[in-house]
């Protein structure tokens, strides 16, 4: 391994690029030249960041469950804040996924965003930096700072570049997630008052000394903070509005990365911090997850807007993640992590596909489409593969995560597993219905007759995701083996 502080470089490279764009790119340049220059800097930054994360993945030792590439620097010692970062098997793929999806979003944004492109790309680079920081933070306060900083650029993206109701959606997104943040902050203050440290590797061994009643209150405050982010029912209503109003790239990052921060928080903070209380309250989370799967699937069936349907499907798919996590089985948690990764790729592909349709017809209403496959066979093929993965077809990424999550929960709660399995059937119904109504049949809208198939930049954005969907489905052990020991280590307390 290199002795370079590679995680710090990966976190701060996008931030340095932002500073360069804001401070040193000459504003007097003509708009077209300025946009090209900004796009080149953003593209170079995202490519280099992606290369760095791939290097980390290659050098990562899967036979070691402890944090690797660890860096630790004192920052504000009086309040326990250190720049303490590292990567284990649970975090590694989310770091890679963040850099990969950011690169794809920047490629697409260069060709589709017409106004304030400099500010738009700056927001994506900021989110990339903050997300990587959150996934690698080992200091709990540092995790909180990165976790909450992500709200600002996402709020701006929805509020400035979103649809007609973007202000309402952006405010709703911000208020819901900020509501969860307040609970998390209260939990942090209490933890520090008792343990006088935010170092995760230190406080995990001491939280059992906290009185049981206080542990239970602490558990609920942290749970709510992460449940809002996932989002779990009843904290879910901000997501459909945010997805419908967000631009395509905003929806990709929201579904592909931001939703995963909540479930990652369960794995990184809640379960290891409060293992006994987590087991006690697991049954409530399991049934909330089952309700989310069935309810969201039924609501998705009734949607007339493509993005709203995909948004509700995301809530259902994240339900499989939470039942897997709270099964407290190696199979279930491994399935949950795999499902998080798979959903990140599948949902990103779905939103990019919807984005290509919207660029041509400027509507997300399902009834306005029909017969698109006859004019866009490449898109239809990509859509079919993505759709089949979304419904959990064997040999696709979606099957592995859902199957392992259900198998894990089946070992501890047969009733919950059987009810949750119905969600797969419902998912197949609404996704096949969507594909049929959009892609098949006769062309009833004359504008569709003038559609052209995917442009090169659109193929460049979607094709890698399709390849990953197939690779994950055919070679799941290459992914599962990387975080196997980290999952085993997580379960030691259970």
Swiss-Prot record:
Q: Which GO terms describe its molecular function?
A: NADH dehydrogenase (ubiquinone) activity; ubiquinone binding
- Mode of membrane association: Multi-pass membrane protein
Transmembrane ranges, per UniProt, are 5-25, 36-58, 90-110, 119-139, 140-160, 173-193, 206-226, 252-272, 281-301, 318-338, 339-359, 376-396, 412-432, 459-479
For whether the record's keyword set contains Phosphoprotein, the answer is no
This protein's GO cellular component annotations are: plasma membrane
The catalytic activity, as recorded, is:
a quinone + NADH + 5 H(+)(in) = a quinol + NAD(+) + 4 H(+)(out)
Q: Where in the cell is it found?
A: Cell membrane
> Which InterPro entries did the record assign?
NADH_Q_OxRdtase_chainM/4, NADH_UbQ_OxRdtase, ND/Mrp_TM
Under which main EC class is this enzyme filed?
translocase
Keyword NAD recorded: yes
Q: Which UniProt keywords apply?
A: Cell membrane, Membrane, NAD, Quinone, Translocase, Transmembrane, Transmembrane helix
Look up the EC number in the record and give it: 7.1.1.-
Q: Which GO terms describe its biological process?
A: ATP synthesis coupled electron transport; electron transport coupled proton transport
By sequence similarity, the record places it as follows: Belongs to the complex I subunit 4 family.
**Family matches, as NCBIfam families:** NDH_I_M, PRK05846.1-3, PRK05846.2-6
User: Which PANTHER family did the record assign?
Assistant: NADH-UBIQUINONE OXIDOREDUCTASE CHAIN 4
Q: State what this protein does.
A: NDH-1 shuttles electrons from NADH, via FMN and iron-sulfur (Fe-S) centers, to quinones in the respiratory chain. Couples the redox reaction to proton translocation (for every two electrons transferred, four hydrogen ions are translocated across the cytoplasmic membrane), and thus conserves the redox energy in a proton gradient.
Spell out the protein name for this chain: NADH-quinone oxidoreductase subunit M
Organism, by scientific name, is Rickettsia typhi (strain ATCC VR-144 / Wilmington)
> Gene encoding this polypeptide?
nuoM
């Amino acid at each position: 391994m290199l002795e370079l502080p590679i995680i710090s470089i990966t976190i701060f490279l996008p931030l340095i690029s932002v500073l360069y764009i804001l401070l040193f790119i000459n504003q007097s340049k003509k708009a077209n030249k300025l946009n090209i220059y900004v796009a080149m800097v953003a593209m170079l930054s995202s490519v280099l960041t992606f290369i760095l994360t791939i290097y980390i993945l290659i050098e990562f030792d899967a036979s070691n469950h402890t944090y690797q590439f660890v860096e630790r620097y004192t920052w504000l010692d009086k309040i326990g804040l250190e720049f303490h970062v590292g990567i284990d098997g649970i975090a590694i793929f989310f770091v890679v996924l963040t850099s990969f999806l950011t690169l794809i979003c920047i490629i697409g944004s260069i060709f589709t965003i017409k106004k304030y492109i400099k500010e738009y790309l700056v927001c994506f680079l900021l989110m990339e930096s903050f997300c990587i920081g959150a996934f690698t933070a080992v200091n709990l306060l540092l995790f909180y700072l990165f976790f909450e900083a992500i709200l600002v650029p996402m709020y701006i993206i929805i509020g400035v570049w979103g649809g007609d109701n973007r202000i309402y959606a952006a405010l709703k997104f911000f208020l819901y997630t900020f509501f969860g943040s307040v609970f998390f902050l209260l939990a942090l203050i209490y933890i520090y008052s008792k343990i006088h440290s935010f170092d995760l590797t230190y406080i995990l061994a001491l939280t059992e000394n906290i009185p049981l009643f206080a542990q239970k209150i602490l558990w609920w405050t942290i749970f709510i903070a992460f449940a809002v982010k996932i989002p779990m029912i009843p904290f879910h209503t901000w997501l459909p509005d945010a997805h419908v109003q967000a631009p395509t790239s905003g929806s990709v990052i929201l579904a592909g990365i931001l939703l995963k921060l909540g479930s990652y928080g369960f794995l990184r903070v809640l379960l290891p911090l409060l293992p006994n209380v987590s087991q006690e309250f697991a049954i409530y989370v399991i049934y909330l997850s089952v309700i989310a799967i069935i309810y969201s699937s039924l609501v998705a069936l009734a949607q007339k807007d493509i993005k709203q349907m995909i948004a509700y499907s995301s809530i259902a798919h994240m339900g499989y993640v939470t039942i897997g996590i709270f099964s407290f089985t190696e199979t279930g948690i491994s399935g949950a992590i795999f499902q998080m990764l798979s959903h990140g790729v599948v949902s990103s592909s779905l939103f990019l596909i919807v984005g290509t349709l919207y660029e041509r017809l400027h509507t997300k209403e399902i009834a306005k489409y029909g017969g698109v496959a006859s004019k866009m066979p490449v898109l239809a093929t990509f859509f079919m593969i993505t759709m089949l993965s979304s419904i959990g077809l064997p040999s696709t990424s979606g099957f592995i995560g859902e199957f392992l999550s259900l198998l894990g929960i089946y070992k501890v709660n047969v009733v919950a597993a059987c009810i949750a399995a119905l969600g797969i059937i419902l998912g197949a119904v609404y996704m096949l219905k969507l594909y049929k109504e959009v892609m098949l049949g006769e062309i009833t809208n004359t504008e569709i007759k003038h559609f052209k198939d995917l442009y090169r930049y659109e193929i460049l954005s979607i094709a890698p995701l399709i390849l990953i969907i197939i690779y994950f489905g055919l070679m799941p052990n290459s992914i599962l083996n990387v975080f196997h020991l980290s999952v085993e280590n997580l379960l030691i307390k259970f």
